[in-house]
């Protein structure tokens, strides 16, 4: 039966968000994810808000691989991994991921959110310490909440090496310290100070975990991620990432680590023990996406070139764009309603850029987030800059 207090609360929230201009629009897309998409009731618009960083979501080889996976294995596994849900294509994908990012082994998940929810409760011991950057992704935060209550959790200010070292010094009596960071921070677009983090973890015998979801396929000459960008392949203990961004854009996530760590995750990680395995069509698509990158690393170079061009173009228009090699360019607005207003203005001009406010970012720090793709042509980039010039 309906609950009147619940109904009243829901209606009040919706009314407040609507009146304050904080309601987020949901656009219905009627075409594949590519630079120009068809929006229901609008027509064709230029997308500058997609995670399709390398333009592989509609790559012919990636699509054909997914179709083959669907034909060969059907719609899904209908089982968790340890019962009858492990397909040979899962093993092929996991071997491909481990080889690509440079670890002993890897395990796939239906999302990187699931991967981070599996990682911390499974591998972190009850007397361990987690040291987490304050701007880490929500999936890391939620994964940490699922750990033993006895685990000590401390948050250090964003990229503050001084505070992190102090925390490492203060927690040396604990069995294992885990330093956890995004490789690329999704709302700031900046890169973790990985060389210094590696040095600190070696100095204090701590484990280093990097969520490279917005870096894999983006950073490094081969698109391997943050560790390749800094020439630190093999120096990160645990890497988590997604298959739903640069690596085909479909879905899925992974943990890449030592063979022992992966075996423990297989045996005890709850997300893969209690939910179906990744569909074969996604495994095939992701495998092919990695092959495309390996066979043609110039696609990564095109992304880097597009990022530099758009970032400079926005700076020339007077927008405050912090220098960064990543494909994420935040434009700070402050007021959430104003950010959403500017997003709608851009949409009316045929360019899709999303305004982000609370709870995705802190109150008072609303922003537009531009996301760049290797698939953008010079004409697309000029169209985008022309629209921003009219704001």
Describe each region flagged by the PLM.
Residues 11-73, 206:
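N-terminal "arm"/small-domain region of PLP-dependent enzymes with the aminotransferase-like
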Residues 296, 301-308, 315-349, 360, ...:
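Conserved PLP-binding catalytic core of the aspartate aminotransferase-like
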Residues 119-138:
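Conserved PLP-anchoring active-site segment centered on the Schiff-base-forming lysine
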Residues 204-207, 214, 219-325:
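Active-site C-terminal subdomain of aminotransferase-like
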Residues 52, 154-210:
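Active-site phosphate-binding strand-loop segment of PLP-dependent enzymes
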Residues 60, 64-68, 72, 95, ...:
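PLP-dependent enzyme catalytic core of the Aspartate aminotransferase-like
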Residues 134-143, 364:
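Short, glycine/polar-rich helix-capping loops at beta-to-alpha or helix-loop-helix junctions
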Residues 64-111:
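Conserved N-terminal alpha-helix of the aminotransferase class I/II PLP-enzyme fold
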């Amino acid at each position: 039966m309906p609950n009147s207090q619940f109904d009243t609360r829901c209606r009040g929230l919706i009314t407040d968000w609507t009146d304050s201009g904080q309601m987020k629009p949901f656009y219905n897309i009627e075409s594949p994810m590519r630079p120009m998409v068809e929006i229901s009731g609008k027509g064709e618009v230029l997308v500058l808000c997609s995670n399709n960083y390398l333009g592989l979501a509609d790559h012919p080889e990636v699509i054909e691989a997914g179709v083959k996976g669907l034909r060969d294995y059907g719609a899904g596994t209908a089982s968790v991994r340890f019962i009858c849900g492990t397909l040979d294509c899962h093993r092929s994908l996991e071997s491909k991921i481990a080889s690509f990012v440079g670890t002993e082994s890897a395990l796939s998940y239906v999302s990187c959110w699931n991967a981070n929810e599996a990682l911390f409760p499974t591998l972190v011991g009850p007397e361990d310490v987690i040291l987490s950057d304050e701007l880490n992704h929500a999936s890391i935060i939620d994964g940490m909440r699922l750990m033993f209550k006895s685990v000590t959790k401390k948050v250090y200010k964003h990229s503050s090496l001084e505070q992190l070292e102090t925390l490492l010094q203060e927690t040396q009596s604990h069995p294992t310290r885990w330093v956890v960071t995004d490789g690329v921070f999704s709302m700031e677009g900046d890169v973790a100070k990985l060389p210094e983090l590696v040095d600190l973890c070696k100095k204090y015998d701590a484990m280093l975990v990097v969520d490279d979801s917005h870096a894999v396929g983006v950073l490094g000459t081969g698109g391997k991620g943050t560790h390749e960008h800094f020439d630190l392949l093999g120096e990160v203990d645990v890497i988590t990432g997604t298959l739903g961004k640069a690596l085909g854009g479909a879905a899925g996530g992974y943990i890449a680590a030592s063979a022992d760590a992966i075996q423990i995750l297989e045996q005890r990680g709850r997300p893969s023990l209690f939910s179906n395995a990744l569909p074969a069509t996604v495994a095939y698509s992701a495998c092919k996406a990695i092959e495309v990158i390996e066979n043609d690393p110039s696609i990564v170079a095109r992304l880097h070139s597009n990022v530099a061009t758009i970032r400079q173009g926005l700076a020339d228009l007077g927008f405050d764009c912090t220098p960064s090699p990543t494909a994420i360019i935040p434009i700070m607005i402050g007021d959430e309603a104003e950010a959403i207003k500017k997003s709608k203005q851009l949409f009316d001009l045929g360019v899709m850029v999303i305004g982000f406010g609370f709870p995705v970012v802190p109150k008072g720090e609303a922003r537009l987030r531009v996301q760049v793709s290797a698939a953008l042509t010079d004409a697309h980039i000029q169209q985008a800059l022309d629209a921003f010039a009219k704001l």
